[in-house]
Structure formats: C-alpha cells, structure tokens
Design a protein with these regions (language model features):
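Donor nucleotide-sugar binding/catalytic pocket of nucleotide-sugar-dependent glycosyltransferases
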Residues: 121-157
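A conserved, positively charged/aromatic
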Residues: 93-94, 100-104, 108-129, 136-137
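Short His-centered aromatic/hydrophobic patch
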Residues: 78-87, 104-105
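Conserved donor-binding/catalytic core segment of Leloir-type glycosyltransferases
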Residues: 5-7, 163-181, 187-190, 204-205
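Conserved active-site histidine-acidic residue motif and adjacent donor-binding/catalytic loop
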Residues: 56-60, 231-245
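A conserved mid-protein helix/loop that constitutes part of the nucleotide-sugar donor-binding site
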Residues: 14-22, 178-195
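Glycosyltransferase donor-sugar binding loop
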Residues: 34-39, 174, 202-218, 234
Length: 245
C-alpha cells in the first residue's frame, strides 16, 4: 500500500472533517494526519488508531512534508480541502514521481485562479457532481466524483417513478449558510417555490452556521421570514447528524 499523508487544514469538526473521520473509522489502513489544534485533533487522538500531528504554521508544515517526501517516508499527500492548493502544487512540481490528491468542496476552489496550473501527478476529487462540473467548465481540469460509502446507488438503476405520499415535504440543507455554498441557487429555488404554489407544503430546514455578516446571507434570512407558501427554519450548527433526524 502507498503511504499517503493526510492534511486537514481545519481543526474544527464540520462537514468535510466529519466525512474524513467516518473514513478513518472504517478504513483498515493506518494514516499519519496533520491537523491544527481543535475538536478534530481530539477525536483522532481519542480514537487511538491513526497518528495525528499538530501544526501551527502552514509554511513549516509544507517544509516538513517536503523533507518527508525527499526521505521517502510518504508516497503522496491528500488534502481534505482546497485552501492549501498553492502549497500542494509547489510540492507536485518538486516531486513529479509522487502522487497528490485534493478534495474540492467549495465553489471558490473551482476557479482557474485558485487551481492554477494542472499537474499530471495531482488528482482532484469531489463528492458533488455540481462541483465536478464547475471545475471542468472553469479550468478544463478533470475532477472526479467520488460516491461516498453511505450510498448504495452507485451502479444501481435509479427509481423510475417518484411519488410524494405526504402533504408536507421537508427538505434538509446541511452546511454553513454562506455565499460560497450555493446561497444564490437556494435563494432562487425558494423564490420559485414561493411563487409557484404546489399541492404539497414545502419546509426547508437549514442545519449549519449562518454568516450574518455577509449582506446577501442576511437579506435571504430576512426574506425567508416573509414567505407564505413555504416555510424556512434555521436550526444553526448541530454537533451530531442524529439531531437532524
């Protein structure tokens, strides 16, 4: 097995960290994980299976990783979000025989300005077909959609007919309410549902922090309170997915 170091730029325990932690809880392999101090580090340490290393300086971290790659300690590096792409691209240039992987999560990471030059030894992955398409359209770079372990639908024919049995349809939207996480599309969809009344009543349940300091976010929350045909409920960040259900 190739020795892949894992980098988590955030030490918090939000969506991408929860997905990564679920993987770490189910994999049969052991990994070295570099992560800032925080909840995520504590969870990995308490799990007692993998080896977490704290870092406080991004530049020092990548100098250390360069040395580890040079010494042959790692065969590659996986980064759990796109914020460190420029550092990873530098390592990819210095070590063309090593493999590098980036999990693209946000729209802001799909731009040509962020991804820059494509390297043959860098692979971009996502768990969203929407993000995958954005990367391809904006940069021409191939991005691969990885279907997560919870979905058995990969390779299985989809449902041919979809019927709604209840008068109320509840839609859960998980993630921080902000402009980089699809606020524009959410707002337009809510407006469409409000202006095109259907036989069923729609409830939108938002689970995640709200960036009220951003004017577009604040305006949407205010407008959501004026809807008559749909109902929007903001629950804030939840610590456990069981709370959602």
């Amino acid at each position: 097995m190739k020795r892949i170091a894992i980098i988590s730029p955030s030490g918090k325990f939000y969506g991408s960290e929860q997905v990564l932690f679920d993987f770490l809880c189910t994999t049969q392999h052991k990994y070295v994980i570099y992560v800032p101090e925080g909840t995520f580090y504590d969870k990995i340490k308490n799990q007692g299976v993998h080896t977490p290393h704290l870092f406080t300086s991004v530049k020092k971290l990548y100098l250390h990783l360069a040395w580890m790659l040079l010494c042959g300690e790692f065969d590659g590096i996986y980064i759990n979000e796109g914020g460190h792409i420029k550092y990873l691209n530098l390592l990819a240039s210095l070590f063309p025989n090593k493999n590098f992987y980036v999990h693209i999560r946000l729209l802001e990471d799909c731009s040509a300005a962020r991804l820059r030059k494509m390297h043959k030894n860098v692979s971009y992955i996502s768990i969203s077909d929407y993000i995958t398409t954005e990367v391809k359209q904006n940069t021409g770079i191939q991005c691969y959609t990885m279907y997560d372990i919870y979905k058995l639908s990969s390779g299985i024919a989809g449902i041919k007919e979809f019927r709604i049995e209840n008068d109320i349809v509840r839609l859960g939207i998980v993630g921080r309410l902000t402009t980089t996480k699809g606020l524009y599309d959410i707002s337009h969809f809510c407006n469409y549902c409000e202006n095109n009344q259907t036989k069923v009543h729609l409830e939108f349940h938002f689970f995640g922090g709200i960036d009220n300091h951003i004017s577009e976010v604040k305006d949407f929350v205010v407008k959501a309170g004026t809807y008559k045909n749909i109902n929007c409920k903001f629950h804030g960040f939840v610590n456990d997915k069981k709370q959602i259900y």
